[in-house]
């Protein structure tokens, strides 16, 4: 299994999943985890060619091969981990994702979820929408498209390149992942202003991805072991991430990092921009449009338990 998730917690979740599979299959089925044997953009081809058997990652990693997948990694002003899991498990999210992966002959299983990312690390305070205009910032996916609408110049940099880019002044801000994972990269040492919440990704999903033919070829017992391991890893990943999140924020404050809430003016502008971005993206792809309608329908069915409840 090729793991695309370099930062510690992401990779640990993949190893935890593999160990759970072996335990539940009583040693009759094992998964060997390899770190980034194949890069994100090469995963589909490597799976098709049989160079790798499976991928551990998040659907958004494959946005270059299918932009519609980005929404399944978590999206701006979306649900928290509980809400995202409810959509994926019971609200039609898994079926919408299956439809997108089916056009590539792939099968995905929802195996983990992490809490909100940080909203971004900045070298100077951000107080108004005007402060974002022309700002060079590491950003990813739909968050990057939304920021671009407000004048930000987004750079999609891999984890190892973010700190050097801040140090050299190539970028003046960065959003990457959970604060606990950002700490491992030393982002707080290069940009001392952290803004919360992570509006761009209130939840991050983790998945197992393999060819449909490989999933079909597994025995019922081995499929059951994998599904049970996914359930176990889902609980483990969220609990572990939340514990580390609290510790990381306490550490940042002790080290003098300025932790700020986003100004309401900026959040309101970002929300408006996101509404326009997702409308434009959905208009280009019928399956993405169906996925978005699935999510909106799920939110409506939940009454007051909306995405806004989490951000606000």
Model segments located where?
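N-terminal secretory/targeting leader peptides
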Residues: 1-84, 99-312
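A short acidic, glycine-rich active-site loop
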Residues: 82-92
